[in-house]
Amino acid sequence: ICACLVGSEMCIRDRYMDAVGDDLGATCGNIINCSYKLFVQTKPDGVLVLGDTNSCLSVIGAKRLHIPIFHMEAGNRCKDECLPEETNRRIVDIISDVNMAYSEHARRYLADCGLPKERTYVTGSPMAEVLRNNLAEIEVSDVHQRLALEKGKYILLSAHREENIDTEKNFFSLFTAINAMADKYDMPILYSCHPRSRNRLQASGF
């Protein structure tokens, strides 16, 4: 098993493909090019991709090389064609050899796309296994002490979607509301921050 990273933040990786380009077109092209070269070099028995990020576009090279493709989190849909993830999902679902849907609902979306049932399996979400495998480390973590936080007395925030961060109106509306919430409940906010969000916050002065 070889875990590959194309540019997002991840602590476990065997190969790093510096695929981040100057713009979206360059990044997507780099992902396909770098992964294709890696597949030629390593000759994998299969390629497993998770989710709907741009890194999933690596399957295009795998398909051309006749390498079996396995897609975890297949079949998810939000029915919003403006979201880049929706395009990625459709591409990867269609060309994957095996689609692993987390729910029966997602499986039905795959069936609606015309995918044969022998290429689709409902596996359930791996979240329970992820939590169980990391529970011991979570329980002894000193993160509250390091960040000077009191258990149950802070707000955990995750907000990184492109339409919320890159659209100025949505961005200011979102973080004005977040600041108001912090003031109302008199709690600090712990923000698990994507690089795009961090840069936007620094530039805006929030």
What are these regions (language model features)?
Residues 6-8, 138-206:
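Donor-nucleotide binding loops and adjacent catalytic segments primarily
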Residues 8-9, 65-66, 86-90, 117-118, ...:
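Short, hinge-like loop/turn segments at secondary-structure boundaries
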Residues 13-15, 119-121, 188:
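Conserved beta-strand segments of alpha/beta enzyme cores
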